[in-house]
């Protein structure tokens, strides 16, 4: 593998502590040539669905890169760390459903590997900070041209954890849809697409009324 000039980071670490900087520092020590692009560090803590939606919406617009994503409430458990090859990128992070939608947005998973090779992680691995100790080093080594299969054994992509399908039901002339994300500007993304809109006679750009327990808004 030729390596990468870019590494992106998407986490729930926030900016009030040094977690983000620690990941930057580990990457810089191993792959000083790589530029790091911060997608966001403001994912709702532990909200894997939120992180997966933001990542999937963003990575198609980024240059060829190693994309590191860490929203990892299962850190320190038996959950796997993985690297997924997809499109012109490699996605690195926990096997908890976070990475799969992003891989699908890049055209699907070509291959998947479990991150178990100690040579490509820090010598001391914290039970609670795999972003710094496992995922950032793996990404940096990939950026330097290390082949993904050096990081650990190939795994069946169908064995990867996936998130439950968001609720979306067409009920007569109504749609009941789960809220997937609410962005910084208050825009609400629902688990409803063009097919569901067409089923009740609507189209992109149509005016609708939203009802929830606090009231309704057009």
Features from the language model and the residues they span:
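Short acidic-glycine loop/turn motifs at beta-strand connectors
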Residues: 85-88, 171, 212-214
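Alpha-helical scaffold segments in soluble metabolic enzymes
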Residues: 22-26, 54-57, 101, 134-141
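N-terminal glycine-rich anion-binding loop in soluble enzyme alpha/beta folds
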Residues: 4-42
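Gly/His-enriched, cation/cofactor- and phosphate-binding structural elements
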Residues: 199-218
